Amino acid sequence: RVRSSAASDVYKRQGSIKEEHYFSGVAPRAELIMVKLAPAKKYNRKIWGITEDVDCYQETNILLGIEYILSVAARLNRPLVLCIGMGSSQGAHEGHSMFATWLNYLCTIPRIGICVSAGNEGNKGRHYSGTFNPERNTDTFELRVGEADKNFFLEIWQNAPCRVMVEFTSPTGEIVYSIFPRFDECREYSFIFCPTRIFINNIILEEETGEQLILVRFEDAFSGIWTIRVTAIDDIFCEFNAWLPSGNIISEETYFLRPNPYTTITSPGNSRNPLTVGAYNQLSGSILISSSRGYTPSNLVKPDIVAPGYALPCPVRNQAFGVASGTGAAAAHTAGIIALLMEWAVEKRNYMTITGRDINLSLIHIS
């Protein structure tokens, strides 16, 4: 999987730092460990249609970076607060990925706290959900593709035990008829009146979740309105979800015409144990419209808390300062609060075996 940078939804540079502009972080005496991730490899970018100018990282490199941070904390014998300010809309959003499982485990180890940004997908129009019942076994929705987005992917997830097939209608009116689920097969479809090719994996049993995944990759996508028709094979009550890529992997000109702003928390923010942080405007008290929303498809309550995430002052390169907005900034603010709690618990020997789960519940109780 690939993950885009989600450190802030809005960032503004405001000039050089002067004496009157000095400011302090939440935990100014904390020591920082920063890991510069290697960009995603070219073959991964090609498969997923991600251009070279987009900040994007492989999950394996993120895991390696976290492992390095853990080794430094163990060598220094100090408590650790891990802040993850990036995410991905790939996956079933259930928190069952290898990355999520590992973070769940780390949260049970004493003296390790983890906070994750919820994502900034609340108002991007990149999630659609539909339902089936015995009287209504089809659902049709529209995808608007912008001029700038030639290569991208779409994931449709169907909860077990229901099975679905899918049809596509291009902006020129050409139809790709019923594509039934298979175990391991990728089909390629082309069109006469537009140059688009689409590659479809309709996987009946996705290996991490056991649910049905329809992975659609567009190559040289024709701009306009694409119509997608999903039909349930089984006459039972069930629900499906469709997600487009998150962050700046695609432009804001590509979106669903009837989106659902809920269930937009990016992975690993949908993990059970890490503290998932949304963002609110601390000046007005309102939730940021871009802040991703819960719950997860299995009704796990996420995000856990919201934190200040509007125009937070921050230092930047070249002795300058700026402001950042979004759930990444809110997660960083929360990481400072967790560091202060770690100081009270571990350094001052009030609760030496405190875990990430203990910290999460403490913050939820006092929020």
Functional labels for PLM-detected ranges:
Residues 1-11, 364-365:
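Single conserved hydrophobic/aromatic residue that forms the stacking wall/gate
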Residues 8, 12-30, 67-76, 293-299, ...:
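Flexible, small-residue-rich helix->loop connector segments that border functional cores
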Residues 12-13, 41, 48-53, 57-81, ...:
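Substrate-binding/charge-relay-adjacent region of secreted/lumenal peptidase catalytic domains
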Residues 90-100, 117-159, 174-183, 253-272, ...:
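Active-site-adjacent substrate-recognition loops and nearby beta-strands
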